[in-house]
């Protein structure tokens, strides 16, 4: 501890001291509030709302609001917030993370800042890890909020659209992180503002914040669906690879080297890559032109042909790198992948990027539709959009640096209401897994005989089943949880504190439910009270009997030493180990914990195995004897720190790459929202039209060029064939030989204005405006989807730029910016082309066209929170594939509005109006 810390206290101590002053203010208000009638106490809510509306600072309202919420809780829930819960509530209100031990009442604590911030009428989101906890907490606390005059909503995955809108319009909304995220993305895919469900991202309280913002930060949400059908294209492209030859290296006559025999493509089986040579490009372009797939004189690398080259490379890989009965088999008319490591069939799995469809075309079986990412976001970027973010958990301090670095969230460690009596014993390390499990069995048997409940934490379902088999063989009754059935697991966890209870749980199972020593009597009392067959007197008598029995069981467990925690191996994160330990010793209860390890455990084997084995050999440890020493524990902790640091780097790198897409996402979503809220887009269309035709004109009539350099016949042909415009600039020049290029451009723009005006006259301005808006939305959506796929392809190979002495991140940022600019140009061209070439005779036709455009062109939409393996491919982790996700939409004003003259958020240094703002 430094001298300054000794004198002034740590940052945490200073904050707690500051909060204690406010606690004294809140406590001073309690006697007066106790004297108020229920009606007078309820009247405080509208009074607070009125004061906020008149401009009073919400922070100044905190002591009174917290005091009112606590008094209401005493009357309604029969629970009074402890002083430490008031401190935790303050930390949450000020946008910090409150670390509170298990059983300290985080759910009740969250009611304080939720009530205070809901008074602003902008919505409060309480985020949990699963639907069961969201529903449980919402139903439990809605009685309190309702009594105080606030509404509560529950945002579950299975509810319908109207129910979602109702949930979000409530003052306080409970839901899961996945559902909030998916709703955000869905809201940015609607074609009518009335279809949105979210109303803005004002304030979020994230429960189990370490699990959501750290453990799940590497696994973005994805909305995907089946893209448009390219079956014919796959079949046609499939004819190209057999016409191309492989470039090979033949030995020189002296046998000392190799010379390249020219060919059309090269292949690298090690990296599973195939590349066209210069000659191969030309040959492929000629073949595709003959097939009618590539326009005469066009290049495969033109922006318009990005899909074509993608399909061509997929077909080449299918023909040259993927072989039947080695990489896949054809079974019942389907291509089934073979696992290259185990040789097993991977039914249901499909290669991505169109490769699977290319193999299906090669084998002449039915081609399944390609999946396409529709929208994506990471939790890191979603939660950072809230105006104010806070979180609570039992274990955050070990990750405090990451919370501060990534989310700008400070961690405040809240002291327990009663000091912990849990005894954390030294780890015991055995040479083999068999010895370790044998020692664990003895420990469990000893606890069982003494009536002490045991919770065994495992790192995987496989280990849970292994241990369950050992206990079954030893005839020890037990329960197994593996984090799948949330409602049932909460029930089992609630009774895991009964005498002789043995519960095996994977690390995450049962989080959010307290283990009460002696069992959870409240659950059993609820069942009795819900039994209509019993009279009130019988209910009261049975409930009293249950409570007396519980007291006896509780005392028995306390005398036996409280809940005993056994860890079967160390997790790579100290935080997860601390979560397991934290299940015991709640609210000052006694308890104990111990980890049993072996040199076969993954963490020890990789990081500390040799060192510990050397110590055991030197000490000549007999079979079955453990080593229990500080040096071993320190080695393990050091290993965990290394893994944590590596995982932090991975998440930080992921965020740096995703920030590029995030900046572009903000621009697209902001412009899309502006489109949705604009009834008349004719000015925007006019601006786009003039830009497109000016660019087209300058392609054939360059600025400051001589008349001899003009290609007016070529321009006339394009206007006639592509744009269906009966207008000849060659004839204009012939009639007026002295006309300038600027004047000709004006004539062209005037003609396009007249054509546009005629279309509006036929169907009416209002009807045509609706059609134009639908055209723009459809163009933005389809090109944004293709752009996401292009970013995905770019990111997958960007780490290879490092071999060329280039910075992959800078290259990714530069190329992503170029792709974004190309996408905006494609959107402009498509919108103008559709609006100018559409042939309409009546209003009915235009209404039908608008309806068709508003329908999604993507079917079978899927929502997924993709699994991510940190150890799968270290190189790719630093330039990871884009994983998409679904997330809720923010209100337009929830994203910072970019002014036309402000710097563009893409980082180019240009003004927004000259960069990504040019679409608008």
Curated annotation (Swiss-Prot):
Keyword Nucleus: no
Disulfide-bond pairs as recorded: none
Cofactor(s) listed in the protein's UniProt record: Zn(2+)
Listed GO MF terms: ATP binding; metal ion binding; protein-exporting ATPase activity
Bilayer disposition of the protein: Peripheral membrane protein
Stored PROSITE patterns: SECA, SECA_MOTOR_DEAD
Binding site residues for ATP: 85, 103-107, 514
Top-level taxon: Bacteria
Primary localization class, coarse: membrane
Alphabetized CDD domains for the sequence: DEXDc_SecA, SF2_C_secA
Enzyme Commission number(s): 7.4.2.8
Catalytic reactions on record: ATP + H2O + cellular proteinSide 1 = ADP + phosphate + cellular proteinSide 2
Gene Ontology process terms (BP): intracellular protein transmembrane transport; protein import; protein targeting; protein transport by the Sec complex
SUPFAM superfamilies to which the protein is assigned, alphabetical: Helical scaffold and wing domains of SecA, P-loop containing nucleoside triphosphate hydrolases, Pre-protein crosslinking domain of SecA
Compartments, record wording: Cell inner membrane; Cytoplasm
Keywords: ATP-binding, Cell inner membrane, Cell membrane, Cytoplasm, Membrane, Metal-binding, Nucleotide-binding, Protein transport, Translocase, Translocation, Transport, Zinc
Sites where the protein binds Zn(2+): 904, 906, 915-916
Similarity-based family: Belongs to the SecA family.
Alphabetical list of PANTHER family matching this protein: CHLOROPLAST PROTEIN-TRANSPORTING ATPASE (PTHR30612:SF0), SECA INNER MEMBRANE COMPONENT OF SEC PROTEIN SECRETION SYSTEM (PTHR30612)
Stated role: Part of the Sec protein translocase complex. Interacts with the SecYEG preprotein conducting channel. Has a central role in coupling the hydrolysis of ATP to the transfer of proteins into and across the cell membrane, serving both as a receptor for the preprotein-SecB complex and as an ATP-driven molecular motor driving the stepwise translocation of polypeptide chains across the membrane.
Matching NCBIfam families: PRK12904.1, secA
Protein name: Protein translocase subunit SecA
The organism of origin for this protein: Janthinobacterium sp. (strain Marseille)
Lineage: Bacteria, Pseudomonadati, Pseudomonadota, Betaproteobacteria, Burkholderiales
Gene assigned in the entry: secA
